[in-house]
Curated annotation (Swiss-Prot):
Belongs to the UPF0201 family. This is UPF0201 protein Msed_1787. The lineage of its organism: Archaea, Thermoproteota, Thermoprotei, Sulfolobales, Sulfolobaceae. InterPro entries: PAB1135-like (IPR002739), Ribosomal_uL5_dom_sf (IPR022803). It comes from Metallosphaera sedula (strain ATCC 51363 / DSM 5348 / JCM 9185 / NBRC 15509 / TH2). HAMAP family: UPF0201. Gene3D superfamilies: 3.30.1440.10.
């Protein structure tokens, strides 16, 4: 079973709609909500890998498959893949991976992907390359 949860803090100085745009630039969610707490938290969810198709496309457009593959593989832990991207870069349509929450001044966008075969998910999103070109294009794994 596939489940994808994407979260982003909405800081007091931020426009909620801009945070939603930053998330939606790379993630086609089926449902969303705003949770109240220390910071307001935008939570978007989906139950299909196709919701990451925009992310898949932009990794190729930006030619960052090698870096993305290394970063994504580091985020696999059991049946969960977790990674973060810079929220302000995402708002303008760019993918910039971050290692800690401090690297994105307004907080990162955090992706958590649950899937039975996360290696296949990484192979689909960011396949191995040679001289910057994908060695293959894997089909999207089944949900």
């Amino acid at each position: 079973m596939t489940r994808i949860v994407v979260t982003a803090e909405i800081r007091p100085s931020e426009d909620e709609d801009k945070v939603k745009v930053a998330v939606a630039n790379f993630f086609s969610f089926k449902s969303s909500k705003v949770e109240e707490g220390k910071y307001r938290l935008f939570v978007a969810e989906s139950d299909t890998l196709s919701s990451l198709s925009k992310f898949h496309r932009v990794l190729r457009e930006e030619r960052i498959l090698d870096a993305a593959r290394k970063y994504l593989r580091r985020g696999i832990e059991g049946d969960r893949l977790t990674f973060m991207i810079h929220k302000q870069a995402a708002y303008v349509g760019k993918i910039t991976f971050v290692d800690s929450e401090n690297e994105s001044p307004l907080g990162p966008i955090t992706y958590t992907v649950f899937h039975r075969d996360l290696e296949a998910v990484v192979d689909w999103l960011a396949p191995r390359t040679s001289r910057g070109r994908p060695l293959w294009d894997n089909p999207m794994p089944e949900d």
